[in-house]
């Protein structure tokens, strides 16, 4: 079931490269299906990718916040999948806060992303997240609210 659910999630994410609205609808349907009792990793991944598909920085911030909140469920310890996902979640939150001009909170979230980066492997994913942290740090230093690819 878990593998099937992740396959559904990543199929919806892949739609984003072709049709953002279809991807947004598919992920929103998965979010609704998962409900509040869905697996934390599934909920977190869906919300994280929904954030990337929003039209405004404010909407993206809302979904990035949901993604992080979904990772932390009282009484459920973080598994390895979520631990490895935290740097990306904090990085996305940092960038969303930067985009809305909340630079102090963005810096705090970026520090958390850096602090959790030690769990990342020295692979393509780890390098992308570390480069994203450096990129957002540069944008924060300039107090830029420009939307740019990370």
Give the predicted meaning of each segment.
Residues 2-3, 41, 84, 124:
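Residue signature of alpha-solenoid helical repeat architecture, marking inter-repeat boundaries
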Residues 8-9, 44-47, 83, 90, ...:
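TPR repeat positional signature
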Residues 16-29, 57-73, 109-111:
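Helix-turn-helix repeat elements of alpha-solenoid scaffolds
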Residues 32-39, 72-82, 119-123:
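Flexible helix-coil transition and linker loops at the boundaries of alpha-helical arrays
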Residues 43-83:
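Alpha-helical adaptor scaffolds
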Residues 57-60, 88-96, 133-150:
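Alpha-helical linker/edge segments of TPR/alpha-solenoid repeat scaffolds
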Residues 105-147:
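Preference for long, well-ordered alpha-helical segments
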């Amino acid at each position: 079931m878990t593998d099937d659910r992740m396959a559904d999630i990543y199929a919806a994410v892949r739609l984003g490269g072709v049709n953002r609205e279809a991807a947004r609808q598919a992920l929103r349907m998965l979010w609704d299906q998962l409900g509040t009792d869905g697996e934390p990793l599934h909920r977190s991944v869906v919300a994280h990718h929904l954030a990337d598909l929003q039209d405004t920085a404010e909407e993206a911030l809302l979904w990035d916040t949901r993604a992080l909140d979904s990772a932390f469920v009282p009484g459920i310890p973080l598994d390895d999948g979520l631990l490895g996902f935290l740097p990306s979640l904090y990085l996305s939150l940092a960038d969303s806060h930067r985009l809305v001009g909340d630079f102090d909170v963005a810096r705090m979230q970026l520090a958390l992303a850096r602090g959790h980066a030690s769990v990342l492997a020295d692979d393509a994913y780890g390098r992308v997240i570390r480069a994203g942290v450096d990129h957002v740090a540069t944008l924060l230093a300039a107090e830029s609210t420009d939307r740019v690819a990370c």
